[in-house]
Regions:
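A positional/architectural concept
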Residues: 1-51
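Charge/polar-rich, low-complexity and marginally structured segments
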Residues: 55-162
Length: 162
C-alpha cells in the first residue's frame, strides 16, 4: 500500500496521494494528477490500475534503450492512428517511446519535404510525451521542461556514441 504524499501512476496519470479515506469500510486513495490541479480522483487502494512511479535508475535504463526501440510500421497510411491508439491503451514506456519516435520522424520527413505536419501525428506525439515525461520528471525530481531536455540530450548523445 502507498502512503500520503507518495507519487503513483494511475492509468496514464502521474498523481500524488493527498489522503487515504474510508468509505463504507473500503479504503480509497484521494489522488491529484500532477498536471491538473482541478481534478481529484478517488480510487480503491486495491485498484489494479495503480502502480509505483519508476526509479531514477529505471529511467536511465529506458533512455539507454531508446535507440533500440523500433518505430511503428504500417502498410496503409490510414492505419497509423489505430496503431497509436492501440499502443496508448497499454501505455508502457516502450509503447510511448514508439509513438514519440514514429510521430516525430514522420513529421520531420514532412518538414524536409516542405509539407504540412500531420495534426494526427502531432496530437499523439504530444500526448505520449506528456505521459512519459510526467513520470520521468517525478522519478528524476526535475520539472517537465528540464526532464524533456535531459531525455533529448541523452538520446542525442547515445546516437553520437554509436
Amino acid at each position: 500500500m502507498f502512503g500520503v504524499n507518495d507519487y503513483i501512476v494511475y492509468r496514464n496519470n502521474v498523481c500524488y496521494i493527498k489522503e487515504i479515506i474510508e468509505i463504507k469500510d473500503k479504503k480509497y486513495y484521494v489522488l491529484f494528477p500532477i498536471d491538473d490541479d482541478s481534478l481529484t480522483i478517488k480510487v480503491p487502494v486495491d485498484n489494479s490500475f495503480i502502480r509505483r512511479v519508476i526509479s531514477k535508475d529505471e529511467v536511465a535504463e529506458i533512455i539507454k534503450n531508446i535507440i533500440n526501440i523500433d518505430i511503428i510500421k504500417v502498410d496503409n497510411e490510414k492505419m497509423i492512428e489505430q496503431e497509436y491508439k492501440k499502443l496508448l491503451e497499454n501505455a508502457t514506456h516502450e509503447n510511448l517511446i514508439k509513438i514519440i519516435k514514429t510521430s516525430y520522424l514522420r513529421n520531420a520527413k514532412r518538414k524536409r519535404e516542405k509539407k504540412k505536419i500531420s495534426e494526427k501525428d502531432d496530437t499523439y506525439f504530444k500526448l505520449a510525451e506528456k505521459i512519459l515525461y510526467n513520470e520521468f520528471s517525478v522519478a528524476l525530481k526535475m520539472n517537465y521542461e528540464d526532464t524533456k531536455k535531459y531525455v533529448v540530450d541523452s538520446v542525442e548523445k547515445g546516437y553520437k556514441d554509436e
